[in-house]
From Swiss-Prot:
GO terms for cellular component: proton-transporting V-type ATPase, V1 domain. It comes from Hordeum vulgare (Barley). GO terms for biological process: ATP metabolic process; vacuolar acidification. NCBIfam families: PRK04196.1, V-ATPase_V1_B. This is V-type proton ATPase subunit B 1. Keywords: Hydrogen ion transport, Ion transport, Transport. One of its GO terms (molecular function) is proton-transporting ATPase activity, rotational mechanism. Belongs to the ATPase alpha/beta chains family. Non-catalytic subunit of the peripheral V1 complex of vacuolar ATPase. V-ATPase is responsible for acidifying a variety of intracellular compartments in eukaryotic cells. InterPro entries: ATP-synt_VA_C, ATPase_a/bsu_AS, ATPase_F1/V1/A1_a/bsu_N, ATPase_F1/V1/A1_a/bsu_nucl-bd, ATPase_V1-cplx_bsu, P-loop_NTPase, V-ATPase_su_B/beta. It holds the Pfam family ATP-synt_ab_N. V-ATPase is a heteromultimeric enzyme composed of a peripheral catalytic V1 complex (main components: subunits A, B, C, D, E, and F) attached to an integral membrane V0 proton pore complex (main component: the proteolipid protein).
Length: 488
């Protein structure tokens, strides 16, 4: 047992590193309460040794005089007050990072689980991340091409954006996420007057994938998918399974984002971070909050959940003078398909839009079942247009939205008055609605459409209407693109 230093500097605290305690006074869920501890620090890492010799890691959550509350990442079963010893390390939780982490699989705590060699760290970084000076942030620009028409044309994702997938139980969000990982690449920005090129700089593109509370089937699906399509060497996987400790879910996204920050800002890579399932993360947060007996907020979630989610989502972006970027696509499953549930509700406030996966489209065998009407990308305007995608992109997107919305209204009206009462114009909108869903929204899981193919397909659908009904597209653009033999 270590000794307490005499006359130690008060600012540093009176705790000597390595001091061990046998003062466990209680266990509540994933928390251990310690008594008679000298100088514990908030967020300090502790090593817990059980009576049988096994060790676990924990983090100080709360300090009150000589009392400390520690959350244990590997769970609290087997911890007693007789044989359990707790050692304070004086360090915050850091994770080893290296370029060698690409192509590897780790558990939720960042330990390799793919039977590969240990990682030789190039640095140890605090998992909470470094604070970024807001004035050093660069506005997200340049489109990330996903190969999915509804996202690329109507909800374009900018490099450095954070945009979630709002899904629900039983919907194919995992398949969509895997498809995005397979097909994602940058659209190179070129000088005005030239066409942009789709999906460039793939060698500089990396994916960090963090799974929280997923079942073994989902974990195997992603692992197999990455290996089969040959993209595994640019992917780092962090897997916290449903049978892993709940508390580990709180650190998994932070370890993943710390790795992403290293790859982006130190190695100059364009990193796409996919976090699934943020609903499991929110439930883990609620569990810790309940164990600490905090006053619950809406539906039992803690009042600080908004702040906590922001500490994850706001770690996306670009920094002045650094070539790399972090783009985030968190996935969350809405309980009972309820978009007003605290998790999607607060997520929508923080992130820059959302992509909505729709059950009705899924029930009609349309894949990917992305409903464009409630979907939104707030930074789309800075990622598209001449020199970045094509000059007609914005107008085509607006016209597709307008016609699809009118088509939905006509469909509802048809259910009331019958098809005979509809005008010839209404019937055009119904034809557009059907073809839009069957040809534009629907595409195969391995069907990659670059942005130019998607825009050309959109024009094919818009030609259902006479020119005078395309109110959202300027005459100049119509002259260039409306006729079938227009030069693209």
């Amino acid at each position: 047992m270590g000794l307490v230093k005499e006359g130690a500097d008060m600012e540093e605290g009176t705790l000597e590193i390595g001091m061990e305690y046998r003062t466990v006074s209680g266990v509540a869920g994933p928390l251990v309460i310690l008594d008679k501890v000298k100088g514990p620090k908030y967020q300090e890492i502790v090593n817990i040794r059980l009576g049988d010799g096994t060790t676990r890691r924990g983090q100080v959550l709360e300090v009150d005089g000589e009392k400390a509350v520690v959350q244990v990442f590997e769970g609290t079963s087997g911890i007693d007050n007789k044989y359990t010893t707790v050692q304070f390390t004086g360090e915050v939780l850091k994770t080893p990072v290296s370029l060698d982490m690409l192509g590897r699989i780790f558990n939720g705590s960042g330990k390799p689980i793919d039977n590969g060699p240990p990682i030789l760290p190039e640095a140890y970084l605090d998992i909470s991340g470094s604070s970024i000076n807001p004035s050093e942030r660069t506005y997200p620009e340049e489109m990330i091409q996903t190969g999915i028409s509804t996202i690329d044309v109507m909800n374009s994702i900018a490099r450095g954006q954070k945009i979630p997938l709002f899904s629900a139980a039983g919907l194919p969000h995992n398949e969509i996420a895997a498809q995005i990982c397979r097909q994602a690449g940058l659209v190179k920005r070129l000088e005005k007057g030239k066409h942009a090129e789709g999906g460039g700089e793939d060698d500089n593109f990396a994916i960090v994938f963090a799974a929280m509370g997923v079942n073994m089937e989902t974990a195997q699906f992603f692992k197999r998918d990455f290996e089969e399509n040959g993209s595994m060497e640019r992917v780092t996987l962090f897997l916290n399974l449903a049978n892993d400790p709940t508390i580990e879910r709180i650190i998994t996204p932070r370890i993943a984002l710390t790795t992403a920050e290293y790859l982006a800002y130190e190695c100059g890579k364009h990193v796409l971070v996919i976090l699934t399932d943020m609903s499991s993360y929110a439930d883990a947060l609620r569990e810790v909050s309940a164990a600490r007996e905090e006053v619950p907020g809406r539906r039992g979630y803690p009042g600080y959940m908004y702040t906590d989610l922001a500490t994850i989502y706001e770690r996306a972006g670009r920094i002045e003078g650094r070539t790399g970027s972090i783009t985030q696509i968190p996935i969350l499953t809405m309980p009972n398909d309820d978009i007003t549930h605290p998790t999607p509700d607060l997520t929508g406030y923080i992130t820059e839009g959302q992509i909505y996966i729709d059950r009705q489209l899924h029930n009609r065998q349309i894949y990917p079942p992305i409903n464009v009407l409630p979907s939104l990308s707030r930074l789309m305007k800075s990622a598209i247009g001449e020199g970045m995608t094509r000059r007609d992109h914005s107008d085509v997107s607006n016209q597709l939205y307008a016609n699809y919305a009118i088509g939905k209204d006509v469909q509802a009206m048809k259910a009331v008055v019958g098809e005979e009462a509809l005008s010839s114009e209404d019937l055009l909108y119904l034809e557009f609605l059907d073809k839009f869903e069957r040809k534009f929204v629907a595409q195969g899981a391995y069907d990659t459409r670059n942005i130019f193919q998607s825009l050309d397909l959109a024009w094919t659908l818009l030609r259902i209407f006479p020119r005078e009904l395309l109110h959202r597209i300027p005459a100049k653009t119509l002259d260039a693109f409306y006729s079938r033999d227009a030069a693209h």
